[in-house]
Amino acid sequence: MEQSNFVNMKLSLVPTLLLLLVLLVFYQHHSSPNLNSNALSSFVDATSLAPSPSPSLSMEFSVASSNLSTISSPPENKGNKRNIIEEGLAKSRSAIREAVRLKKFVSDKEETFVPRGAVYRNAFAFHQSHIEMEKKFKVWVYREGETPLVHMGPMNNIYSIEGQFMDEIETGMSPFAANNPEEAHAFLLPVSVANIVHYLYRPLVTYSREQLHKVFLDYVDVVAHKYPYWNRSLGADHFYVSCHDWAPDVSGSNPELMKNLIRVLCNANTSEGFMPQRDVSIPEINIPGGHLGPPRLSRSSGHDRPILAFFAGGSHGYIRRILLQHWKDKDEEVQVHEYLAKNKDYFKLMATARFCLCPSGYEVASPRVVAAINLGCVPVIISDHYALPFSDVLDWTKFTIHVPSKKIPEIKTILKSISWRRYRVLQRRVLQVQRHFVINRPSQPFDMLRMLLHSVWLRRLNLRLP
């Protein structure tokens, strides 16, 4: 009899235990950060700020989802400042939605530049979003670590945007630098991939990423255990910036830990794990010593450009090898050279061409894109898996030509088929987007550094923390 009562008691507990289990799962689901909330698509229609289709990928704007982290669970601490931040972001979403609906912006200061035209996916959404960013966005730079591996990056040559951005945000003069982490919307991991490779891989006797992984993982481990911010969002409001070819490999050190981290990269190769919904594509720019970028030509008509297309560069990667094989020194109109004579000026030749060929090298990005835009030359993107920079807001089909690698033999036919009128429209639009591909120090609204920040801002808008 006693045994029967005991069995009945155990059976009666089963529904209670099941209910507790359901409640536990419900709580865990709602207490984790909402990393898959299509916040942007919910307040702006799909044609506004959603990333563009790249040549090989249709992109939708949503942060990668995640329920688990290899770090400890987020602490239960919903402070007033955090609520204020989330409320401010909600108001920004509403303002952007209204700008799209009413087709006008709202600003509490005079706007010196108003984005308009076909080069923007939705000029009203972009403009209002930029206004909201200028008013609110704050980035906290972790103080841990020492130079040269942390808090310092190259300021010149092709990796320079890494150092320029880090220097801009860390000098204390940037209006986007948070005074304390509690007021920050996003968190910069100021680790320099370029400097890690430069200082720890000399002499270069191995291509193993082990040392790179160790430095980056150690840094994340320190800040994740010292502060609550990484664990709170599972890294989804954290980012790093790098133009080095090895930069995408950082996430390979611990894919589970890094799966929400925003990677701001020049090497935005969708065939190698770049995720436009989460990651940010930035331009590669070659900054010579004593300058902030390549020469700039603000006005030039096609009549001043006798060369149909121009390229000069080494045989780096399979796309360039195909290009040189078909066109090297073979055509007066499509001028393709592996090396230029010493008496030839590279930038002057670009400035006398209507179209500038921008093939991928060993990696997808090329500084020729920025150089071409600054020189008023219509870029011809020759790449198969390149997620183009700032595609959240810029419609690259309106001011560039894309040629997949399989059509390299047809380049002349493709370019000759473009009417004079169509070319002039493309070139005028190239001149229109120049401001977005210029580095200023200090940075200015809508320039390259602000566009980088705006890309991170959009991904933070798309994230709702509990």
From Swiss-Prot:
GO biological process: cell wall organization; protein glycosylation
Membrane topology: Single-pass type II membrane protein
Sequence intervals crossing the membrane: 6-26
Residue positions with a glycan: 67, 231, 269
Lumenal compartment segments: 27-466
EC category name: transferase
UniProt GO MF annotations: glycosyltransferase activity
Assigned EC number: 2.4.-.-
Keywords on record: Cell wall biogenesis/degradation, Glycoprotein, Glycosyltransferase, Golgi apparatus, Membrane, Signal-anchor, Transferase, Transmembrane, Transmembrane helix
GO cellular component, one term: Golgi membrane
Side of membrane Cytoplasmic, spans: 1-5
Major place of residence: Golgi
Subcellular location(s) per record: Golgi apparatus membrane
InterPro entries linked to this entry: Exostosin (IPR004263), Exostosin_GT47 (IPR040911)
Protein family according to the UniProt entry: Belongs to the glycosyltransferase 47 family.
Role according to the record: May be involved in cell wall biosynthesis.
Protein known as: Probable glycosyltransferase At5g20260
Organism this protein belongs to: Arabidopsis thaliana
